[in-house]
């Protein structure tokens, strides 16, 4: 179990999201992610689920193509920010559920699209202060990730798609992560070369290989033939999953 409070981790995430500082590779990947999705959503409107929706920005970005938007967010403070943003932008088809997405109650085959963006897939894990828990075997078959994504994969309609923004496990990614977290007032506690970066404030962010992605998604019932990797840049993929059957 973790002694770091959920509030501490939420505050670290909020600080990173609101920071004016962002390393160029991360900024570039986020921008390319949004460009690709805006283009893909032109055929809407769609019913969208967004795992770890943060400040609700995507409900605004995708509003022209959105029939309804359900954001799932564990931080009440981030949810408040989302409500404020939606009020300001006059978004009336969005709803936020304050919960752990792994425990969310969602209707089967309801959504056209499921999102888990801005590297949120790499934040999903069993919380522990013992960093040795997160060994290669754990990262290749992360139980909490599998529980969360399986739940939302069941909520995806046949013919629907899920999109995940994921860090590549390369040194350039690790350098960008460390740079970002240090510049947002956090203290990195993992040695260089780990497959994840953790901070004393409770933030945790994993990097992925195509094999580790296929292994984790395979445990969710998703075949390798249904997974596509879209390069965002040298440090990130937008991973697309198409649901062809139950």
Which positions does each model-derived feature cover?
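Class I SAM-dependent methyltransferase SAM/SAH-binding core
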Residues: 57, 62-103
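A short beta-strand submotif of the Rossmann-like class I SAM-dependent methyltransferase core
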Residues: 116-118
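Core SAM-dependent methyltransferase catalytic element
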Residues: 221-222, 228-246
